[in-house]
Swiss-Prot record:
Exerts its effect at some terminal stage of cytochrome c oxidase synthesis, probably by being involved in the insertion of the copper B into subunit I. GO terms for biological process: pollen germination; positive regulation of cytochrome-c oxidase activity; post-embryonic root morphogenesis. This is Cytochrome c oxidase assembly protein COX11, mitochondrial. GO terms for molecular function: copper ion binding. GO terms for cellular component: mitochondrial inner membrane; mitochondrion. Residues 1-80 form a transit peptide.
Length: 287
């Protein structure tokens, strides 16, 4: 017979239960007493510190993982940002160089018109800038009876741009005029190539400060001249020296002026087509 069966009908079982209850009661009292004296309180703080430690360690691990992910994202962003600005700079440089090339080509074609506009706006090179025309100046000085005694030597110069197969020369070397007088000079141009060439000329007067008194009445500058192979033409220059040249103190000591022309090639056409067009004769059918 087992011990539990023997104790079932006896009082010993109730005794043991009471003993078990009384054994738990002092523990509770003891714990409460120690709690009042701080022992259980310290145990509670210990357990809390354990929980805080494990909680902080778990949060530390999460923070470390988030910091690692953030550093990886930052490195990727830096790598992308270093590649992206370089590509943007390359595209900007390409656009800039393309614009420069097109700008240079445009300036090449617009050089002569821009130079003409500049001369007309500033009076550079003897271009008439004042509102009074040359004819009005001549008439005004003729009526006032302006007399000048100073003689000015005007020399002529001719040049052609590189690659232009023209012979371009002044007919006369120089002309002597007085302020208030007009003079006529000629330039000769000849096409030495085997193809038609169209050219346009620019000019300048030196010294430049005397250019405002050098007025051209008739000139071939800034006008296209087309010459066939072997063709030669004479181009006149009719100019006038303002009488105020003599009274201007800035012109003291200036007795020589140089008028220079430079021809530039505008276009070159096909010689074969031109010759065929000029020599084309209608064929008559014979019966």
């Amino acid at each position: 017979m087992s011990w539990s069966k023997a104790c079932r009908g006896t009082r010993i079982s109730s005794y043991l239960e009471n003993l078990h209850r009384t054994s738990q009661y002092p523990r509770t009292i003891l714990c409460s007493r120690y709690y009042t004296h701080g022992a259980c309180k310290s145990n509670e703080h210990y357990l809390r510190s354990k929980r805080v430690f494990w909680g902080s360690s778990s949060s530390w691990s999460l923070n470390s993982h988030s910091a690692t992910a953030k550093s990886m994202l930052d490195s990727a962003h830096r790598q992308y940002s270093t590649h992206s600005p370089s590509e943007t700079k390359s595209q900007k440089m390409l656009y800039y160089l393309t614009a420069v090339v097109f700008g240079m080509v445009g300036l090449t074609y617009a050089a002569v018109p821009l130079y003409r506009t500049f001369c007309q706006a500033t009076g550079y090179g003897g271009t008439v800038q004042r509102k009074e025309t040359v004819e009005e100046k001549i008439a005004r000085h003729s009526e006032s009876g302006t007399v000048t005694e100073r003689e000015i030597v005007v020399q002529f110069n001719a040049d052609v741009a590189d690659g232009m197969q023209w012979k371009f020369t002044p007919t006369q070397r120089e002309v002597r005029v007085k302020p208030g007088e007009s003079a006529l000079a000629f330039y000769t141009a000849e096409n030495k190539s085997s193809a038609p060439i169209t050219g346009v000329s620019t000019y300048n007067v030196t010294p430049m400060k005397a250019g405002v008194y050098f007025n051209k009445i008739q000139c071939f500058c800034f006008e296209e001249q087309r010459l066939l192979p072997g063709e030669q033409i004479d181009m006149p220059v009719f100019f006038y020296i303002d009488p105020e040249f003599e009274t201007d103190p800035r012109m003291d000591g200036i007795n020589n002026l140089i008028l220079s022309y430079t021809f530039f090639k505008v276009s070159e056409e096909n010689t074969t087509e031109t010759v065929n067009n000029n020599n084309s004769v209608p064929v008559q059918e014979t019966n």
